[in-house]
């Protein structure tokens, strides 16, 4: 590959080595069978783990996004498979740019198509256009914080988004901060997400990125673009709501959830019961499916199978569609345990599909966590890495809604950077590290969103008004008491809602199926209902008392017997004439006599009038409803924009959290690697220290500046050096050597990179062999040298001893305590060479001299040999201090005589010195003239034994 690329570029093409630093205008190639990541400006290599799916492009893109954020540019070119798909998501989430080769232009379109399908690709281009596009983007990329001079997109006044009402240049002169505010407002009005609930930093970075992609120089120009280009508005909205999720995100947290929440829930579930779970902000569904798999795993382990229902919600419809489909790229294999992949997925066409039994337990629905009503009676509520995108007040609203949703004793599971804060007193902590809580008490019903009044005016609920004034009740009872012998009666308001009851009215009441209400239309028995409604309507219209004709009641309705009943409505006098404040008494009178003259009610006429009025009200209601529908459509658009803004903030903070998590994981891995290197270094140091101690030689290490880097304990005998001297120049230290050229020799060794040896003497009378050896630190330019001082005094003494005995005419050998020869002199060596043993194989160092004398008995008079052996042994064993004897040792045709002396070596090792001197001339003279031999044998001190022994 390197040679292939080199033919098409003038830039150097290099294959990466570990810790290689980035360089401009250079092409770096990843070596085979490795994973390459980026740490700062250095490339790190690691071997592939063949036990798991290898995705080197994803790994590199992710590390690049973590390190460079919005400065990262990812390009996916021709290739098979889906490697790079997850990585472009990480780059996009960090604010970087992702580009793919146009699949139509690619020889293998698998990787580009997979990346484009994520929605994270900013542009799909032909191969020849990618380079110029990136260069132009980097030149024109704006810096939003510098453009606005502000940090908050607040205070915008609103702007119309109808293309027909916006003219090019209409925003000229607008301040950048105001332009940013209008952009956020337009964005919020484009859907059901209010982006004012999102943290401003997220919004700013996303707008900056889109401005860079569209190459727009300033905010006012981008505002005009948004008002004219609905496609760009949709792209910006998608930018804010890009989902960032994965299976088993934070595996340790899910393991803790399974142990402390899921297993107990399964164990406590009754037969036939249902476990209810709500996962809010589910994105593309990975978290919901993770929970379902964990519950199924717990079911199998416990042998219990309660019904499981998971409600997975998200504000973005596209995310819900993706999640509901249940199709996932092959890259998820890196996130899931192998057993779960095999149990809960099927593979087809390079994709993983969730199994039907898992899919059927999950209901995916669009839901706005901040505005839509929450679910109820949940055993578990999860909302991970969503709150971190919200402003604090929005976080509180979301938390209170989730508190209302979870039952007492249920569980709440949040993301790693999220906390309860405002509702923490209502929960107990199960795992602070993994953000798991248990509800202690039920939550209050969430209040209507503070912005709801801008869009919807809710109708007052038809429920009991607990705050009805007591004085009105009393006035109603007083009116009834003055007029009648009090019959059973009800006090109702202008909405026909019951406020109070007088007497026994239960037989006239009947609770109907459906929503609870105190409206008489939901409470009176059927025969009385139309009459009571007509009477109340007439009394309200005329402002006077109204009574019905006698109403026949069949048996079994109000009692066992048939009866007749008359209804009467009496207005209650109050201090206000408003319709809303009017109260009425509805009395139930038994019909026991003729009409009392009070005007009755013509049911047909009153019903007709009522119908006319209701038709008029219906027409007005329709007009009002149409206006409300239009208002709701506008409100829905604003809410959608708000939801999109929140989702984008969620994604941005989640991306930041993912980056931090990735950095944390990389730091943990790096820490483990460093710890391993430290352990190895400690072992190496211990080995080196032990080696220098056992070698018992003075050793000093210096760097290229001749500064001491370390030394052995023995070096303190020659140099006045201590631990505090590490880091000092060697020349500053005094030493006990006659070696003025020490520093010069070290410099020559470093410059020539060659070994240096020299013998020097010490001021203490000892001698040393100095060895200098240069070295280089691997993968570094650092160099140094090590110098050792070997004490060779004993060797020099031995050499001196050898020179002394070599100067003697006698044949000298030194024996150890066993009779083995340790040392011979030159005369001994010459004699052996002249007498058949030139290589000293039989009489040289290492041979046993006593043994050689025993062997010689066959060739020489055994008496001499025997006495020689006994004499030498007596000296070796300490029985004699000196042994001497004369013996013949003839050469061919020449008789010769020798004298042998043996003296012990003093010391713990023992041994002896044996010397042989030729005395042939002396012996001949002695035999010729005995009187001339009075001086004794040559070399004898006159105390030795007589006799001779063969020379071995």
Curated annotation (Swiss-Prot):
CheB-type methylesterase domain mapped to chain residues = 1-141
Q: Which CDD domains match?
A: CheB-CheR_fusion, PAS
Q: Where is the composition biased (Gly residues)?
A: 936-952
Q: Which Pfam families match?
A: CheB_methylest (PF01339), CheR (PF01739), CheR_N (PF03705), PAS_10 (PF13596), PAS_4 (PF08448)
Which parts of the sequence are annotated with region: Disordered?
A: 923-952
One GO biological-process annotation of the entry reads:
chemotaxis
Query: Bias category Polar residues: which stretches?
Result: 923-935
CheR-type methyltransferase domain segment(s): 168-440
Q: What is a single molecular function from GO for this protein?
A: protein-glutamate methylesterase activity
Top-rank taxon: Bacteria
Q: Gene3D superfamilies annotated for this entry? A: Methylesterase CheB, C-terminal domain, PAS domain, Vaccinia Virus protein VP39
Question: Would you tell me the Gene Ontology cellular component terms?
Answer: cytoplasm
Write down the PANTHER family for this protein, in alphabetical order: CHEMOTAXIS PROTEIN METHYLTRANSFERASE, PROTEIN-GLUTAMATE O-METHYLTRANSFERASE
The name on file for this protein is Uncharacterized 104.1 kDa protein in hypE 3'region
Species, as recorded: Rhodobacter capsulatus (Rhodopseudomonas capsulata)
- Give the organism's phylogenetic lineage: Bacteria, Pseudomonadati, Pseudomonadota, Alphaproteobacteria, Rhodobacterales
């Amino acid at each position: 590959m390197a040679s292939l690329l080199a033919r098409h570029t003038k830039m150097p093409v290099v294959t990466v080595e570990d810790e290689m630093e980035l360089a401009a205008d250079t092409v770096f190639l990843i070596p085979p069978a490795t994973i390459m990541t980026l740490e700062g400006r250095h490339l790190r290599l690691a071997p592939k783990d063949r036990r798991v799916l290898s995705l080197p492009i994803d790994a590199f893109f992710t590390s690049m996004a973590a390190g460079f954020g919005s400065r990262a540019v990812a390009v996916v070119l021709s290739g098979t498979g889906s490697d790079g798909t997850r990585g472009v998501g990480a780059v996009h989430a960090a604010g970087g740019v992702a580009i793919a080769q146009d699949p139509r232009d690619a020889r293998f379109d698998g990787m580009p198509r997979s990346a484009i399908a994520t929605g994270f690709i900013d542009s799909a281009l032909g191969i020849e256009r990618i380079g110029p596009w990136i260069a132009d983007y980097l030149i024109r990329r704006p810096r939003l914080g510098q453009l606005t001079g502000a940090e908050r997109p607040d205070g915008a006044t609103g702007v119309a988004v109808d293309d027909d009402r916006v003219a090019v240049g209409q925003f000229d002169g607008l301040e950048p901060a105001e332009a940013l505010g209008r952009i956020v407002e337009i964005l919020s009005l484009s859907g059901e997400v209010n982006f004012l609930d999102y943290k401003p930093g997220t919004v700013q970075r996303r707008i900056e990125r889109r401005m860079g992609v569209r190459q727009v120089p300033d905010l006012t120009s981008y505002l005009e673009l948004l008002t004219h280009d609905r496609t760009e508005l949709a792209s910006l909205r998608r930018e804010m709501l890009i989902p960032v999720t994965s299976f088993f995100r934070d595996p340790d947290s899910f393991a803790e959830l399974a142990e402390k929440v899921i297993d107990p829930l399964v164990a406590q579930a009754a037969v036939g019961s249902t476990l209810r779970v709500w996962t809010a902000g589910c994105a593309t569904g990975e978290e919901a499916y993770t929970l379902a798999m964990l519950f199924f795993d717990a079911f199998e382990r416990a042998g219990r199978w309660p019904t499981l229902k998971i409600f997975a919600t998200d504000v973005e419809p596209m995310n819900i569609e993706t999640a509901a489909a249940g199709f996932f790229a092959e890259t998820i294999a890196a996130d899931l345990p192998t057993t779960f992949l095999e149990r809960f997925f099927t593979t087809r066409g390079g994709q993983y599909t969730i199994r039907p039994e898992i899919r059927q337990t999950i209901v995916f629905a669009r839901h706005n966590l901040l505005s839509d009503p929450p679910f109820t009676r949940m055993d578990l509520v999860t909302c991970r890495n969503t709150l971190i995108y919200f402003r604090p007040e929005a976080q509180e609203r979301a938390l209170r809604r989730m508190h209302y949703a979870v039952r007492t004793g249920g569980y709440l599971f949040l993301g790693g950077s999220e906390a309860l804060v405002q509702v923490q007193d209502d929960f107990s902590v199960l795992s602070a590290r993994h953000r798991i809580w248990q509800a202690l008490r039920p939550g209050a019903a969430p209040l209507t969103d503070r912005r709801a009044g801008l869009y919807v005016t809710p109708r007052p609920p038809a429920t009991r008004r607990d705050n009805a004034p007591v004085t009105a009740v009393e006035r109603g009872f007083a009116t009834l008491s003055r007029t009648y012998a009090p019959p059973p009666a009800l006090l109702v308001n202008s909405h026909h809602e019951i406020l109070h009851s007088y007497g026994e009215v239960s037989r006239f009441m009947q609770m109907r199926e459906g929503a609870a209400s105190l409206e008489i239309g939901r409470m009176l028995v059927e025969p009385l209902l139309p009459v009571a409604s007509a009477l109340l309507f007439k009394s309200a219209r005329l402002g006077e008392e109204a009574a019905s004709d006698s109403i026949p009641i069949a048996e079994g309705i109000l009692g066992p017997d048939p009866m007749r009943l008359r209804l009467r409505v009496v207005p209650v006098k109050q201090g206000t004439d408003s319709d809303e404040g009017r109260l009425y008494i509805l009395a139930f009178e038994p019909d026991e006599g003729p009409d009392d003259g009070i005007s009755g009610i013509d049911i047909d006429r009153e019903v007709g009038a009522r119908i006319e009025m209701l038709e008029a009200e219906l027409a007005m209601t329709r007009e009002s409803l149409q206006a409300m529908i239009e208002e709701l459509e506008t409100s829905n658009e604003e809410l959608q924009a708000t939801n999109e803004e929140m989702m984008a903030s969620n994604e941005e903070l989640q991306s930041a959290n993912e980056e931090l998590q990735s950095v944390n994981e990389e730091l943990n891995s790096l820490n483990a690697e460093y710890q391993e290197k430290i352990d190895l270094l400690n072992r190496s140091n211990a080995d080196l220290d032990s080696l220098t101690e056992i070698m018992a030689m003075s050793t000093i290490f210096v760097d290229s500046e001749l500064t001491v880097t370390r030394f052995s304990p023995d070096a303190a005998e020659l140099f006045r050096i201590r631990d505090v001297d590490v880091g000092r120049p060697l020349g500053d230290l005094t030493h006990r050597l006659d070696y003025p050229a020490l520093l010069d020799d070290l410099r020559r060794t470093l410059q020539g990179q060659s070994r240096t040896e020299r013998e020097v003497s010490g001021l203490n009378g000892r001698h040393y062999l100095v060895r200098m050896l240069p070295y280089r630190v691997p993968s570094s330019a650092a160099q140094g040298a090590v110098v050792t001082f070997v004490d060779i005094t004993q060797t020099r003494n031995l050499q001196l001893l050898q020179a002394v005995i070599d100067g003697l005419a006698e044949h000298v050998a030194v024996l150890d305590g066993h009779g083995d020869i340790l040392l011979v002199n030159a005369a001994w060596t010459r004699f052996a060479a002249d007498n058949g043993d030139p290589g000293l194989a039989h009489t040289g160092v290492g041979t046993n001299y006593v043994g050689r004398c025993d062997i010689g008995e066959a060739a020489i008079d055994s008496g001499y040999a025997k006495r020689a052996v006994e004499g030498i042994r007596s000296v070796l064993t300490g029985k004699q201090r000196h042994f001497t004897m004369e013996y013949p040792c003839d050469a061919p045709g020449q008789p010769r005589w020798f004298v042998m002396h043996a003296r012990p070596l003093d010391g713990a090792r023992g041994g002896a010195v044996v010397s042989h001197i030729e005395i042939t001339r002396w012996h001949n003279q002695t035999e010729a003239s005995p009187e001339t031999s009075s001086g004794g044998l040559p070399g004898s001190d006159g105390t030795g034994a007589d006799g001779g022994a063969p020379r071995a």
